Amino acid sequence: SEAGIEEKISLNSEEKDLIARYAALTVNKNDTVFIDAGTTTEKMAEYITEQGALYVTNGFDAAQILAKKGLRVYLTGGRVKASTGALTGAACVETLKNFNFTKAFLGTNGVSVNDGLTTPDAEEAYVKRTAAEKSYITYVLCDHTKFNVTAAVTFAECRNVCIITDRLSDSRYAKLTVVKEVSQ
């Protein structure tokens, strides 16, 4: 079973922080941004300062963080996944279909050359896939431990996303797509 959010936040915290800080800086005025539920994307919300963008998220915590900053934020509908606080399911996907995102920021449980970007939950995969399809650019926030890992359900191919990571030790990924390595 998937680790709960408290457990995930403590895993590779420094790396996630670097990735989140970099990702937040890519948000520009007039962007329409989807922020996925998850630990690294939630950290990203803490670093976002752009007032002139519109934010949509399926994560309760990210929505609260953004709203407290006075930013324009929409929370999708959907079923609440207790372990992660993510909103999923048909209602969430229907909300996403109404938006034309300039940027989507997604978390992942695994990245593999053959299987692409994966997650253990089919409903979350559907949400991620829809957000990616509705976005001009899709960023996947992914620390080094997620590479060469495959979870049950694929939501995107590597070539269709930009990966932001703390460290890339397998050069095959850089041949498949844009990979931004961030460090201190």
State each model region's role.
Residues 4-7, 22-28, 52-60, 87-95, ...:
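Phosphate-binding glycine-rich loops and adjacent basic patches that engage nucleotide phosphates
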Residues 12, 28, 58, 167-170:
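Serine/threonine-rich low-complexity intrinsically disordered regions
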Residues 1-37, 45, 49-54, 66-71:
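HTH-adjacent hinge/linker in prokaryotic transcriptional regulators
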Residues 3, 7-14, 18, 39, ...:
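Residues at secondary-structure transition points
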Residues 61-184:
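Conserved phosphate- and dinucleotide-binding cores of soluble alpha/beta proteins
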Residues 42:
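Glycine-rich SAM-binding Motif I of class I
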